[in-house]
Amino acid sequence: MIPKKLVHFEYIQINLASPERILQWGQRTLSNGEIVGEVTRSETINYRTLKPEMDGLFCERIFGPVKDWECHCGRYKRVRYNKNSEISIVCERCGVEVIESGVRRHRMGHIKLASPVTHVWYLKGIPSYISVILGMPRKDVENIVYYNNNDSISFKNISQFLTENRFFSNSTDILDDLLNIKEKEEEISGGEAIYKMLKNFDLKATAQKIREDLAENEAAWTQSSFFNGEDSDWVLDENQWNKKNQDWQIEEERRNKKRNKLIKRLRIINHFIATGAKPEWMVLSILPVLPPELRPMVQLDGGRFATSDLNDLYRRVINRNNRLAKLNNMLAPEIVVRSEKRMLQESVDALIDNGKRGKALVGNNKIPLKSLSDIIKGKQGRFRQNLLGKRVDYSGRSVIVVGPNLKLHQCGLPKEMAIELFQPFVIHTLINEGLANNIKGAKKIIQNSDPILWEILNQVIQGHPVLLNRAPTLHRLGIQAFEPILVEGRAIQLHPLVCPAFNADFDGDQMAVHIPLSLEAQTEARLLMLASSNLLSPATGLPIISPSQDMVLGCYYLTTEDIRLRGTKSHYFSSLEQVIMAYDQKKINLHTIVWVRFSGIIDSKYIKQNPIEIRVDSLGFVSYIYKNYQMRKDFKNNLISQYIRTTPGRILFNQVIQNSLDYSPSEY
């Protein structure tokens, strides 16, 4: 057996595949010189022997043996026939290569189409690359591909034929020429017509012509040239000026549309030139067939089989392709051949992207068949589901709920989830502290949920950050680190201020939890990824941590005052603590207007206002009464006391801010 070679590569590029490349994928030469790879039959397995049919969709000669080191007929079995051999053995009777069955996961086949068909992505996509390249409306291209039009070329040929002074020829010559015209009409229909048009398309010459047209268009048309016409010497009144300006705007809009169309066409042509792809590769003459292990057929209980939808789509293509080849050999009527070509085009469209053209093909259960595009696109597709979104160990997932008692860098982790995620660390700690003799004993403690377990778990999670991720991760703040806090229930608790960074809300969103294992990963998470260290948006530099929704509403509710209490008897307190005490004793509510003695610095805007009332007592003390402020001074103008008008809610709000800032306020 040939040893496997390691191939090093730097990147993967997705490009158009040429017919030669597709043939190279699905065609191989066996050690006996036989060339295999073409799938010519639509059968899958034999209903009696349950073995794959030869030259079918599961053929062992094309894709490899079903069982390791065993051919189709059973002549070669076990590994001893191929041990220490650089050249694989091919069975002389059935032609199957005696090799491992794992090759059925990557060996491809191919179908040679009896008539070229267009690739539905490049015909029905936005933009339609085929129509843009050819400079034709997409509807006209579709009419040619699906045989929906009356060919203008055929009528042109007939009119040209009738004007060539041939009216006096015999009927046999006229009939021969009309048949020749019919043959010419056949050459310009369907995918074959598109293929010939694309094959004869000169990319570089067309690109140069478009550049010249763009330059000429820019130079020839300016606003000044439009207004400097034959009436440029006349003084225009307002109505004439408005009409001419309106005409110019219409012409400018038309010119911009033409310019954008040329730029779009030039951009696509430049991509073809840069990548080395040829436009005719958008028309398929050879269709690749996926390896059978990627479209399996599984036997169920009771003898029934479950098969991939791709097998039904491939079967439809093969049946129509074989029928078209048979009709071509039979010299069938043109209308029948056209209908079969159109059906072949539709079957290939359904295989590549079912439902792209219109109504999707459905199976026996009335559910649309899953095509090749459906396998790779979307959330459940190959890229997002299997390549970008692989499942990893030491991770979990749950619904998020708000955690109002958490700090910004903390998250609430359910105990049930935490014991599973941190289980290796818990087992290690249980053994080190002598609470368990081995791993089996430690797992028994975990299964029994002993009270000592939660103490050990709290000890383990101290200083061990976890990573929270919400899909889709559109920027780096989609994954942040938090210190876990054990909570009851099964939901992850999240601080509401970090929701904008994750673009999350609490209407059922789910988030994933990942555990950094190594010391380096934990250090990186703590220093770089902690939520309290990511306050600014990496895109704009603006704060991404900002209160919103219920937080803003709560702050407003806390600091508002009840206007219905205006004009009632005011309450006076000698300190802020007395106000809080009265609120705790339910003597007043959050919105009660109170006057409280305050010894701090008052904002100067209150003092600059004119007082509402000035009182002077018998001792010469002066009281200045403002709308929200009162102060009392002695006869030497020394401040004795000052009161401010506020509410208990504002006092609580101010204390929370003071405690978070951890400094004495300079103003209230």
Swiss-Prot record:
Catalytic activity from the UniProt record: RNA(n) + a ribonucleoside 5'-triphosphate = RNA(n+1) + diphosphate
The protein's role, per its UniProt record: DNA-dependent RNA polymerase catalyzes the transcription of DNA into RNA using the four ribonucleoside triphosphates as substrates.
Annotated Mg(2+) binding sites: D505, D507, D509
Any single Gene Ontology cellular-component annotation: mitochondrion
Family recorded in the similarity comment: Belongs to the RNA polymerase beta' chain family. RpoC1 subfamily.
Annotated InterPro entries: DNA-dir_RpoC_beta_prime, RNA_pol_asu, RNA_pol_N, RNA_pol_Rpb1_1, RNA_pol_Rpb1_3, RNA_pol_Rpb1_3_sf, RNA_pol_Rpb1_clamp_domain, RNApol_RpoC1
Protein name: DNA-directed RNA polymerase subunit beta'
Subunit structure of this chain's protein: In plastids the minimal PEP RNA polymerase catalytic core is composed of four subunits: alpha, beta, beta', and beta''. When a (nuclear-encoded) sigma factor is associated with the core the holoenzyme is formed, which can initiate transcription.
Gene Ontology biological process terms, A to Z: DNA-templated transcription
PANTHER family: DNA-DIRECTED RNA POLYMERASE, DNA-DIRECTED RNA POLYMERASE SUBUNIT BETA
Entry EC number(s): 2.7.7.6
Cofactor: Mg(2+); Zn(2+)
Database matches in Gene3D superfamilies: 1.10.40.90, 2.40.40.20, RNA polymerase II, clamp domain (4.10.860.120), RNA polymerase Rpb1, domain 3 (1.10.274.100)
Binding positions (Zn(2+)): C71, C73, C91, C94
Cofactor note: Binds 1 Mg(2+) ion per subunit. Binds 1 Zn(2+) ion per subunit.
Top EC class, one word: transferase
SMART domains: RPOLA_N (SM00663)
Molecular function terms, GO-annotated: DNA binding; DNA-directed RNA polymerase activity; magnesium ion binding; zinc ion binding
